[in-house]
Amino acid sequence: MKISIRFFNDREVRALWDDDQSKWWFSVLDIVGVLNDENDYAKIRNYWKYLKAKLKKENNQLVRATTQLKLTASDGKKYNTDTLDSNGVVELAKHFPNNRAMKFLDWFLYSDTSIDGQSKKKAYTLFES
């Protein structure tokens, strides 16, 4: 798997490329931190735990869409963490009705500096060469 780290407003958003499924998986905790503008890992983790339980209770598909993958943490060790694909990230952002969520989605979906934007640029460059 290929690892990619992008920055939204100087905040890290980690992603892994899955060759088997040909798609990116994004760290849920990184996205929750961005959407809540929170730096405290414990608060981010607790909020995701709360939101995940609430969504599970509502039978929301988003919880079933999460996949646990190993990502490198700030301590340098790899831990299993919840990840979502692009569609899941968009759905997750809908549960954060604030301006940050809209700005994040604009960056995530439409920006040339987004992960997909970078991938498309690279693909076009390879295709044209």
Spell out what each predicted region is.
Residues 1-129:
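An anion-engaging/catalytic patch
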